[in-house]
Amino acid sequence: VDFSIYKSKSALSVKLVKPTFETDSQGRTIMKRSGGILLEFAPSIGTRKYDWTRKGSFMLSPIEAAELANRLNPSRQSIAQKVEFFHDPGMGGSSQGSVTKSLKMEAMPDGTGGVFLNYSQTKFGEKLNVNIPVSFGEVSALELLIKHLVPRVMGFFDEDSMTSSLSSSSSSSNSASYGY
């Protein structure tokens, strides 16, 4: 999956990062690492040209992605509300605070149903800010895409792993045998 939105001053790319699975000692498939939805923001360097070498990346967890998708739903009043996510990849370690990222969504003030996505990153004192307006149609497409991807990043629709998980768990009535 690769969905992109291109505007005059910035671009947004949406990508699926699948979860990874492994087989435990009893032959059950378990999720090793949850997937996510990767948002990549690039500033413009000219007409229809974007500097992807200076891109900012923000990986939405399944819970963050679900919240964002629900806030994107134009039939709900929640689109008028702001939503903001903050990540510090070094949190709890010696590099805490050296890289921080935030993603903020807020409704366009003109009431058209569009939103602004604002990405901010501070990396060793250097700042990157990329703002992208997302039209009503793009909001609708983004909402549908994210809602479709959330179960997949949680591992529910990976056919190989689910087949393996379901077949290994059928011999046991314990729901914990699914490994999720």
What is the meaning of each model-derived region?
Residues 1-24, 47:
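Short N-terminal edge-element motif at the start of the domain
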Residues 74-94, 154-171:
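Short glycine-rich, low-complexity/disordered patches
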Residues 120-180:
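Mixed-charge, glycine-accented linear interaction segment located at domain edges/termini
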Residues 45-49, 56-78:
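Compact, well-ordered interaction domains used in eukaryotic information-processing assemblies
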Residues 43-58, 123-134:
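A cross-kingdom feature marking solvent-exposed beta-strand/loop segments within repeated
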Residues 26-48, 114-118:
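A short, structured beta-strand/loop element
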